[in-house]
């Protein structure tokens, strides 16, 4: 294992000397402006990829828009950074093949709208209110007139129907 001598640490057959005195002297001689550059030089290799980040904006190969942003480096090939085009909402890699990807692929979908009142309808038996809640059509019936005629009254006042986008009745 490792043993400690007055000269340094012996590890795997090699002696590592202590240089704490020389490091402290070097830190004292550096002005504060150079401390930031020393910290950058001593950073890990993951920070080096951030330094390689492209500075110039590259036009989108599909729509030729200059509204692109750098996303990250490709995991398989660091020489092909991944970009995102704000114009056509597609990802692309510089130097990579253009794939036939639909617009907005891989992006998060927006939340559906909240509760929206579609309309208020009336008929002979009672008042019918139609509302749209998260893509479902909901009908509320007030059964005052239906109960007065002696007909069967439902215990559940709300009735759910599927609403289709092609305009057919629900």
Swiss-Prot record:
Predominant place of localization: nucleus
Upregulation: Circadian-regulation. The transcript level rises progressively from dawn and decreases during the night.
Tissue: Expressed in the vasculature of cotyledons and hypocotyls, leaves and roots.
Record: residues binding Zn(2+): 60, 63, 85, 88
Entry annotated with the keyword Ligase: no
Mapped zinc finger ranges (Dof-type): 58-112
GO annotation (BP), single: negative regulation of DNA-templated transcription
The protein's name in its UniProt record: Cyclic dof factor 4
Natural source organism: Arabidopsis thaliana (Mouse-ear cress)
Organism ancestry: Eukaryota, Viridiplantae, Streptophyta, Embryophyta, Tracheophyta
Gene: CDF4
